[in-house]
Design a protein with these regions (language model features):
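N-terminal signal-anchor transmembrane alpha helix
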Residues: 6-43, 49
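Aromatic-anchored segments of alpha-helical transmembrane domains
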Residues: 23, 27-28, 111-121
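Extracytosolic (periplasmic/ER-lumenal) interhelical loops and adjacent juxtamembrane/interface segments
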Residues: 39-70
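Individual transmembrane alpha-helix segments
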Residues: 63-83
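Internal alpha-helical transmembrane segments of multi-pass membrane proteins
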Residues: 95-113
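Juxtamembrane "helix-exit" motif on the non-cytosolic side of transmembrane helices
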Residues: 120-128
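Non-cytosolic membrane-interface motifs at loop->transmembrane helix junctions
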Residues: 128-140
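Hydrophobic cores of alpha-helical transmembrane segments in multi-pass inner/ER membrane proteins
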Residues: 141-153
Length: 158
């Protein structure tokens, strides 16, 4: 018997590009929503970069400074895009044989589930993410799911 992933005809290249595109567009959506509704840019962006960077660099990086920090931003970006690609590859397994409309619907659901996993599941290990639980982050996760699903479907048809 062959392993499950060998039986699912996932286009891994399309999933890679879908993860990168979704990571970029979801981040842009989050920044636009912060700008429109919170008035706390760039500080909130620097906060989230430190929250992500602390996964690798440790919680000692968390004392919040409202300043750009190259090491934190580089590590946060690496984590963000690594997870974006992994999540996109997982999503691809659920939509590989679906049409575009169904894929987008699954992407929306995936975004909601991803928000729960990231903001409630991972906070058991990384409790500092609790402060990032808000509607803007939820919307960004849903945008991620929509973009990852639609981009994967379009690219996988080529």
């Amino acid at each position: 018997m062959t392993p499950l992933l060998k039986r699912i005809p996932i286009n891994w290249t399309a999933a890679l590009y879908a993860g990168i595109a979704a990571g970029i567009i979801a981040t842009m959506a989050q920044i636009i929503l912060w700008w429109a509704f919170s008035g706390s840019l760039p500080g909130i962006m620097f906060r989230d970069a430190r929250l992500a960077a602390a996964i690798i660099l440790g919680p000692e990086i968390l004392p919040m400074q409202v300043a750009f920090d190259w090491p934190a931003m580089i590590v946060a970006t690496m984590i963000h895009f690594s997870l974006s690609v992994i999540y996109s590859m997982i999503l691809a397994a659920f939509i590989v044989r679906r049409d575009l409309a169904v894929s987008i619907f699954v992407g929306i659901e995936f975004g909601f589930i991803l928000f729960g996993v990231n903001m409630y599941g991972f906070t058991m290990i990384f409790p500092w993410f609790e402060e990032a639980r808000d509607w803007v982050t939820l919307v960004a996760h849903v945008v991620f799911g929509i973009v990852a699903a639609s981009t994967y479907r379009v690219l996988s048809l080529r």
